[in-house]
């Protein structure tokens, strides 16, 4: 069973020039948005909605997702950025410790969810072709597909790692255990990329690799579960009458996605300012509970005042 364990020490992007790097994490976001766009296009065509409304919906969704996710991360998990590196909150650069192009890192799904809801509300105020709930019921299908790739991006970056485990599914996250300065110091290799590669490829540094603990690949657990969240939503939308019940898909999305998040948190390491409450639950779990309750409300109690 140990054959299922593996070491994770990848390149995380492609150097363009200077301090600019194309991060694979950013590529995963692009894939998520483009896939979501195609899913929404298919929905618009199926329901004979004017495609002129699709491009602005895409723009609102991208902006709302990125702003909400970034602000959510800062408020919930990394509040020290407000005083220590304020401009990095809004820009794809970090300035503390030297200028570096990082892409948009540090993005929280709870913040993204809130941002999307607000963004769709603002979009609906300008484009009144359907109700807000109609839009939310369909946008969440795209969002659930995108979540699959975002967690793959987290895995590539060796972030949102799991707790130490003896599970046969465990992974050794080399780049989480050793930061760039540490790996250069430990190996004596000046180029940190070559230093990382040497840890897994050069027997001389086997002791450094052996020191890395085996952890749950929590990102992959989530990504795998989100595949089923998407498939369930898509099936209900396409094949059942529930897909036309106002608020049902939106509510089901909240229940499924945040239930997955709640349980995966048990095998995740705390992030940033994350804390454990008196109930033994962490920040991510406490933030997930209201979303599940709201989802149940929309599934079983909500009655629209008007229908489109």
Please state what every model-predicted region is.
Residues 1-308:
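Hydrophobic, membrane-interfacing alpha helices
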């Amino acid at each position: 069973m140990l054959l299922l364990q593996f070491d994770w020490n990848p390149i995380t992007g492609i150097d363009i020039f200077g301090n600019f790097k194309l991060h694979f994490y950013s590529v995963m976001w692009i894939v998520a948005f483009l896939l979501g766009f195609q899913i929404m296009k298919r929905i618009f065509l199926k329901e004979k909605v004017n495609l002129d409304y699709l491009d602005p919906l895409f723009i609102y969704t991208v902006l709302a997702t990125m702003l909400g996710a970034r602000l959510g991360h800062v408020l919930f998990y990394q509040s020290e950025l407000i005083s220590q590196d304020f401009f990095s909150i809004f820009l794809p650069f970090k300035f503390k410790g030297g200028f570096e192009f990082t892409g948009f890192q540090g993005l929280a799904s709870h913040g993204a969810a809130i941002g999307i809801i607000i963004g769709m509300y603002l979009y609906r105020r300008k484009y009144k072709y359907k109700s807000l709930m109609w839009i939310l019921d369909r946008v969440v299908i795209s969002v659930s597909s995108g979540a699959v790739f975002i967690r793959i991006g987290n895995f590539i970056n060796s972030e949102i790692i799991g707790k130490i485990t003896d599970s046969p599914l465990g992974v050794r996250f080399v780049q989480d255990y050793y930061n760039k300065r540490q790996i250069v110091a430990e190996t004596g290799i000046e180029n940190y990329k070559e230093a990382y590669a040497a840890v897994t490829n050069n027997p001389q540094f086997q002791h450094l690799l052996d020191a890395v603990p085996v952890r749950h690949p929590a990102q992959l657990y989530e990504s795998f579960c989100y595949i089923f969240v998407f498939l369930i939503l898509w099936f209900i939308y396409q094949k059942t009458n529930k897909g036309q019940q106002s608020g049902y898909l939106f509510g089901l999305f909240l229940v499924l996605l945040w239930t997955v998040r709640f349980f995966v948190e048990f095998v995740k390491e705390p992030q940033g300012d994350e804390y454990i409450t008196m109930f033994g639950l962490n920040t991510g779990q406490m933030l997930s509970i209201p979303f599940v309750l709201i989802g149940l409300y929309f599934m079983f109690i909500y009655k629209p005042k008007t229908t489109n």
